[in-house]
Curated annotation (Swiss-Prot):
Identification of the protein by name: ATP-dependent Clp protease ATP-binding subunit ClpX
Chain residues that bind Zn(2+): 13, 16, 35, 38
Organism listed in the record: Bacillus subtilis (strain 168)
Nucleotide-binding found in the keyword field: yes
Assembly: Component of the ClpX-ClpP complex. Forms a hexameric ring that, in the presence of ATP, binds to fourteen ClpP subunits assembled into a disk-like structure with a central cavity, resembling the structure of eukaryotic proteasomes.
Transmembrane residue ranges: none
Family: Belongs to the ClpX chaperone family.
Reported function: ATP-dependent specificity component of the Clp protease. It directs the protease to specific substrates. Can perform chaperone functions in the absence of ClpP. Probably the major protease that degrades proteins tagged by trans-translation.
Gene Ontology MF terms: ATP binding; ATP hydrolysis activity; ATP-dependent protein folding chaperone; protein dimerization activity; unfolded protein binding; zinc ion binding
Length: 420
């Protein structure tokens, strides 16, 4: 089992072949030996490779303007929110590159709060940022979280989702992005601290404080509740960027009251009342979030506040057609695979946008509307090889009329034949 030099009967390094007399130290393993020189060489190789990986990962963080330009390819509108996010994300990863200290000045982490109506693009913005930076990304729902000791999800399970997104590479996960949705749903029900514990509100905010600020958290590998004698994954949250989003329904009334109070004399209330909801959201301050029900410590962990506008008909039509992965482009590609050209008339796009506004679902509801319109088309057309083009009209959207189908010779299929 031992490796001997046959001539002198000495032990030798299994890697370089030097004898124990030719090296300073020989470390024994199960049936093998390695000398101090080979150990030093291996250490240098490993450190060099790991160092190179680290440099490649965050050496070329896009500049804020570049980040916004890429966001423009996937997300329509919300220019002010994009600008705020681009600066915050750039500063965050610049801080990581500098190891959090520059000339003994410690750089604090700036997590982000996104405030905007349902379907305005909060989740999509966060997802796109993670894609731009090529970092792990996880989405969590704040409504499912409870503080320790109550039935529900522990806040550490948020971190488990990020670790899973990084294929259990903890070091990679420690530089990822977590988007916590519906954060407004864990607001305290009143401005005054409650004597009894608020399981779904203040308690969750308290539980989130540590991981938002930066701590070494113990995460159960299989999720669920912690229990004794269980192994944990240790993860440092110092460099994880947290983006918390919510609709914050009713906060515009709080902002309106604050603006009204600051105007002295006649017309004070009118000035605040005339402001549209989107304008009010753009004027949100930390004190408004405090009155809404977030605790001061929690607001302090989210120093960057970005507000999103409600999407109008024009913006929703643009969302349907302009982004790289726009829904209309996706459905066109689906029918193209069946050798059928798909066309949406302008009136059809406008009616789809109007339906989304009526349902108050914003951009989030666009896919379900189009899926409903396209169901019969996608069911029937794969079985037909005589159709060249399918045209979705305004009447198709509003009254459920069949789309116009054109044959390869240019003639239009009658509606009777289509429904047959």
């Amino acid at each position: 089992m031992f490796k001997f030099n046959e001539e002198k009967g000495q032990l030798k390094c299994s890697f370089c072949g030097k004898t124990q007399d030719q090296v300073r130290k020989l470390v024994a393993g199960p049936g093998v030996y390695i000398c101090d020189e080979c150990i030093e060489l291996c250490t240098e190789i490993v450190e060099e490779e790991l160092g190179t990986e680290e440099e490649v990962e965050f050496k070329d963080v896009p500049k804020p303007q570049e980040i916004r330009e890429i966001l423009n390819e996937y997300v329509i509108g919300q220019d002010q929110a994009k600008k705020s996010l681009a600066v915050a994300v750039y500063n965050h990863y610049k801080r990581i590159n500098s190891n959090s200290k520059v000339d003994d000045v410690e750089l604090s982490k700036s997590n982000i709060s996104l405030i905007g109506p349902t379907g305005s693009g909060k989740t999509l913005l966060a997802q796109t940022l993670a894609r731009i930076l090529n970092v792990p990304f996880a989405i969590a729902d704040a409504t499912s979280l409870t503080e320790a000791g109550y039935v529900g999800e522990d806040v550490e399970n948020i971190l488990l989702k990020l670790i899973q997104a990084a294929d259990y590479d903890v070091e990679k996960a420690e530089k990822g992005i977590i988007y916590i949705d519906e954060i407004d749903k864990v607001a305290r029900k009143s401005e005054n601290p409650s004597i009894t514990r608020d399981v779904s509100g203040e308690g969750v905010q308290q539980a989130l404080l540590k991981i938002l600020e930066g701590t070494v958290a113990s995460v159960p590998p299989q999720g669920g509740r912690k229990h004794p004698h269980q192994e944990f994954i240790q993860i440092d949250t110092t460099n994880i960027l947290f983006i918390c989003g919510g609709a914050f329904d009713g906060i515009e009334q709080i902002i309106k009251r604050r603006l009204g109070q600051k105007v002295i004399g006649f017309g004070a209330d009118n000035k605040a009342a005339d402001l549209e909801k989107e304008d009010l959201l753009s004027k949100v301050l930390p004190e408004d979030l405090l009155r809404f029900g977030l605790i001061p410590e929690f607001i302090g962990r989210l120093p960057v506040i970005a507000s999103l506008e409600k999407l109008d008909e024009e913006a929703l039509v643009a969302i349907l057609t302009k982004p790289k992965n726009a829904l209309v482009k996706q459905f066109k590609k689906m029918l193209e695979l069946d050798n059928v050209e798909l066309e949406f008339e302008e009136e059809a796009l406008s009616e789809i946008a109007k339906k989304a506004i009526e349902r108050k679902t914003g951009a989030r509801g666009l896919r379900s509307i189009i899926e409903g319109i396209m169901l019969d088309v996608m069911f029937e057309l794969p079985s037909r090889d005589d159709i060249e083009k399918c045209v979705i009209t305004g009447a198709t959207v509003t009254h459920g009329e069949p789309p116009r189908l054109l044959l390869k010779d240019g003639t239009e299929v009658s509606q009777d034949k289509t429904s047959a």
